[in-house]
């Protein structure tokens, strides 16, 4: 790369990077400005989500009351921006409103102390008290007729309840995306409550929304963790890699601009600034649709959709085709004598360009692998640019990438083979045993949840063509392992987990993969109560039965971490036979009472 070209790119990049597409005038009243931009419906929805994500235990009616008060106040400010308190920041207005909740101290304990602080400390304090695993009852789906009646009787309240229930269980759910889910939820009821067979129409749609919603929440949680724990440089690096894969025809300056704006949007949402986030996301969608020619040929059908669908579609858009004539990277990043000069002049820009060039050529790599390669390249330049002969020192840098590329390739290959051989349930069990041996201190419910989700990678990714398997699998595993990190941070029990979670975002998955059996762990004493079952086991759904069995499996491994595969398989086969036998018996409870102790004794003997 010619030095002049690099300097001009640096100028372009830094101006684009600092500017982005958002040009915000200062407004007399921020709340009036957002109300006008978003419209009443979206404004109310976002305020409800914000309050539900902060105060996760408050009853629905309390939140609706707060939202109505904020909305009426916003309308006052729209009518007269200089009215009293209209000039206050949104954090001040929202924080003041949260602090009026009478039961704050008794419901949330020390969170009430946040109210003694001033902004911005007060908002930071509220954010720190968001609970990723709130003690809320599982959502039970009513009968279809009951839901349809509620939908017809009061559609607005029905949809608000959906926003409230999802937001309080997922305090980092991407708010504008949750409005999109609510719109789909509404459309499903509007269509299916008219259908001849309401249940056949509605239930698959609700299942799909639930599964997509959980996945969306987990993906956003990783983005927020990345920003909160590793700073915006880590998030920007992730975004450069991902957008360069999606938009390989876009110039580096264009990708940089999009990255800056995406970082702003996600920083706002992760920080609880949901009105600004939704407004800026709409602006970003508008910008992308006005500049399709310089971004991607795949945006057209997204841009014809209404706002919420458009933003969702743009976020999920498939990768554009790679330009046919991309030159080899070696010329600019290995063979050039100017590498150290360019690197020293503007390290982050040079590394950003390297990441952009590498990612647009490799849609077949996971984002996390691309970031590891950029990190390895950076480490090599740090070392070599201080050496006597820098060029000689970094000449083989691309060869050093090979083991980094092969590690996830082999991991995906081995695990997909295991998945094909075992099927999903038994593949989950294999992962349960693997992870319980690695980190036996982690709570059983967390190990079951995380291993079940890790096991879903098979069905999600292993059927894909080779070129799509690694990005699908490794980036999905990063999302699931982030859930483990988030839960573990709340109640830390394992130094190994803390180390893998906090040392490096891009190396989390390899760190967990490399963990061995924890030799220092003192096995858990055998507790017959854990393996005592009753007739209610027979009425459980298939999924609930699996969770019960998997819970028992984790407890077995915690009791005997060095048990062989054969020993564990023998016990689990006996368990399945015992449950099947008693569920077929005339007096189920009597069977469980009689056969249960025999199963426990046989299990202990098998594992002795």
UniProtKB/Swiss-Prot annotation:
Modified residues (Phosphoserine): 29, 82, 89, 297, 443, 513
Residues annotated as binding Cu cation: 27
Domain called Albumin: residue spans: 19-210, 211-403, 404-601
PTM sites of type N6-succinyllysine: 229, 460, 543, 588
A cellular component annotation (GO) from this entry: cytoplasm
Binding site for Ca(2+) 2: 37, 279, 283
UniProt entry tagged with the keyword Metal-binding: yes
UniProt: Zn(2+) binding residues: 91, 271, 273
Signal peptide feature range: 1-18
Description of post-translational modifications: Phosphorylated by FAM20C in the extracellular medium.
Keywords associated with the record: Calcium, Cleavage on pair of basic residues, Copper, Disulfide bond, Lipid-binding, Metal-binding, Methylation, Phosphoprotein, Repeat, Secreted, Signal, Zinc
InterPro entries from the UniProt entry: ALB/AFP/VDB, Serum_albumin-like, Serum_albumin/AFP/Afamin, Serum_albumin_CS, Serum_albumin_N
A Pfam family of this chain: Serum_albumin
Sites of N6-methyllysine modification: 558
Disulfide links within the chain: 77-86, 99-115, 114-125, 148-193, 192-201, 224-270, 269-277, 289-303, 302-313, 340-385, 384-393, 416-462, 461-472, 485-501, 500-511, 538-583, 582-591
One example GO MF annotation: metal ion binding
PANTHER family for the chain: ALBUMIN (PTHR11385:SF15), SERUM ALBUMIN-RELATED (PTHR11385)
Function of the molecule: Binds water, Ca(2+), Na(+), K(+), fatty acids, hormones, bilirubin and drugs. Its main function is the regulation of the colloidal osmotic pressure of blood. Major zinc transporter in plasma, typically binds about 80% of all plasma zinc. Major calcium and magnesium transporter in plasma, binds approximately 45% of circulating calcium and magnesium in plasma. Potentially has more than two calcium-binding sites and might additionally bind calcium in a non-specific manner.
Subunit record text: Interacts with FCGRT; this interaction regulates ALB homeostasis. Interacts with TASOR. In plasma, occurs in a covalently-linked complex with chromophore-bound alpha-1-microglobulin; this interaction does not prevent fatty acid binding to ALB.
Protein's name according to its UniProt entry: Albumin
Organism: Macaca fascicularis
Gene name per UniProt: ALB
């Amino acid at each position: 790369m010619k030095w002049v070209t690099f300097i001009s790119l640096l100028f372009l990049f830094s101006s684009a990077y600092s500017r982005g597409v958002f040009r915000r005038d200062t407004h007399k009243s921020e709340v009036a400005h957002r109300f006008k931009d978003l419209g009443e419906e979206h404004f109310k929805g976002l305020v409800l989500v914000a309050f539900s994500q902060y105060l996760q235990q408050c009853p629905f009616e309390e939140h609706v009351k707060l939202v109505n008060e904020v909305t009426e106040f916003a309308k006052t400010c729209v009518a007269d921006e200089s009215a009293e308190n209209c000039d206050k920041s949104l954090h001040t207005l929202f924080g003041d409103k949260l602090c009026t909740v009478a039961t704050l101290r008794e419901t949330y304990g020390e969170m009430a102390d946040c109210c003694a602080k001033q902004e911005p400390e007060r908002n930071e304090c509220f954010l720190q008290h968001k609970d990723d695993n709130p003690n809320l009852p599982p959502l039970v789906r009513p009968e279809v007729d009951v839901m349809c009646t509620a939908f017809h009787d009061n559609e607005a309240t029905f949809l608000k309840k959906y926003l409230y229930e999802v937001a309080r269980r997922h305090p980092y759910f991407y708010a504008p995306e949750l409005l999109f889910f609510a719109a789909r939820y509404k459309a499903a009821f509007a269509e299916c409550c008219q259908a001849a067979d309401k249940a056949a129409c509605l239930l698959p749609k609700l299942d799909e929304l639930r599964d997509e919603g959980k996945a969306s929440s987990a993906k956003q949680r990783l983005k927020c963790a990345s920003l909160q724990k590793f700073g915006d440089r880590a998030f920007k690096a992730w975004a450069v890699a991902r957008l360069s894969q999606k938009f390989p025809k876009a110039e580096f300056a264009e990708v940089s601009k999009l990255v800056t704006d995406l970082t702003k949007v996600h920083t706002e949402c992760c920080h609880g600034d949901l009105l600004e986030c939704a407004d800026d996301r709409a602006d970003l969608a508008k910008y992308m649709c006005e500049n399709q020619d310089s971004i991607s040929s795949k945006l057209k059908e997204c841009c014809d959709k209404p706002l919420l669908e458009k933003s969702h579609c743009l976020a999920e858009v498939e990768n554009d085709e790679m330009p046919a004539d991309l030159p080899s990277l070696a010329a600019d990043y290995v063979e050039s004598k100017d590498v150290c000069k360019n690197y020293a002049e503007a390290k982050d820009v040079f590394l950003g360009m390297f990441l952009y060039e590498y990612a647009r050529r490799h849609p077949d790599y996971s984002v996390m692998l691309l970031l590891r390669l950029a990190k390895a390249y950076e480490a090599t330049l740090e070392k070599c640019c201080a050496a006597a002969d820098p060029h000689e020192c970094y000449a083989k840098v691309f060869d050093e990438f090979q083991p980094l590329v092969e590690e996830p390739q082999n991991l995906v290959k081995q695990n997909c083979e295991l998945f094909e051989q075992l099927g999903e349930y038994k593949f989950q069990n294999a992962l349960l045993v693997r992870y319980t041996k690695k980190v036996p201190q982690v709570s059983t419910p967390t190990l079951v949840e995380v291993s079940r989700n890790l096991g879903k990678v098979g069905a999600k990714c292993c059927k894909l063509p080779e070129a799509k398997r690694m990005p699908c699998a490794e980036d999905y595993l990063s999302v699931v392992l982030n859930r483990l990190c988030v839960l573990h941070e709340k109640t830390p029990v394992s130094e190994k987990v803390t180390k893998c979670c906090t040392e490096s975002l891009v190396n989390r998955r390899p760190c967990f993969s490399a963990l061995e059996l924890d030799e220092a762990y003192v096995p858990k004493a055998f507790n017959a109560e854990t393996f005592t079952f009753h007739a209610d086991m027979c009425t459980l759904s298939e999924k609930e039965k699996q969770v019960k069995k998997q819970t028992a499996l984790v407890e077995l491994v915690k009791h005997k971490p060095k048990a062989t595969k054969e020993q564990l398989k023998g016990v689990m086969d006996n368990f399945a036979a015992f449950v099947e036998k008693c569920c077929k018996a005339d007096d189920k409870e009597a069977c469980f009472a009689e056969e249960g102790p025999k199963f426990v004794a046989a299990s202990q003997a098998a594992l002795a």
